[in-house]
Amino acid sequence: MATLKPFAALRPKPELAERICELPYDVMSSDEARQMAAGNPLSFLHVSKPEIDLPSGTDLYAPEVYAKGKENFNRLIAEGALRQDTQPRFYLYRQIMGRHSQVGLVAAASCEEHLRGVIKKHELTRPDKEEDRVRHIEALNSQTGPVFLTYRAVAALDEFVARRITGKPEVDFTAKDGVHHTAWSVGDAEGIKFIAAEFARIPCLYIADGHHRSAAAARVYLSRSSGRQSALTSPGNDQSRLTSAATVGSSGEFLAVIFPHSQMQILPYNRVLKDLKNLSPDQLQ
């Protein structure tokens, strides 16, 4: 069975969402991120790629990078740009890219099920990248990017989602890259119970993207639950803050967005070579 839980998200103020929301941290270089966030102090890149606020050439894994991310994250909260919901809930998130549309469920997934293989993996992780995400989670006491999961579509869930997204969205904007983002929340007891029960019947979930994020979350969970506390889990600082970002404490959940397989679209992931090393294109082939 797949265990998904509602959570009290820390979300962008609706009218600021377009200025806050950004692409994932790992699809751009530091220089590209600096250009994208230039002149926009609300850009979430100040949190997800905080080296952009430090001198060029700063070691990406230096302690001051994570400290700057924490500082910027707390600033967005203090300014009211990010606000936490008062009650746990599920969230529905739609992306429209050209003619393609997909609607996923944003929820707290189980670190235990990740470790036991209920959440299926398909790739190995790089130690340096995994460690980077561990340190980012520990510094912020939050996860700032969801793990992208999928499951075999269930008709009852499809019908439930289709009904719910006819209501007025809470966030609705088109990003600079042309992708249209829309979000709704499911906070009523009946809706929450239905979603949890339907997923409890699903035998497994699959990671589509986010192996480093999920592995890092599981490591933080194991560390905290076994008593090897990070500096941020001192007495009085144990509140989990699953955000549009999300925190992992000893409760053992990680932020995920889960799409049915029927709406998934496989996109090319082409590599670009900067230097052929004196080889001709024919020789390279």
Description of each model-found segment:
Residues 222-251:
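Intrinsic disorder/low-complexity segments
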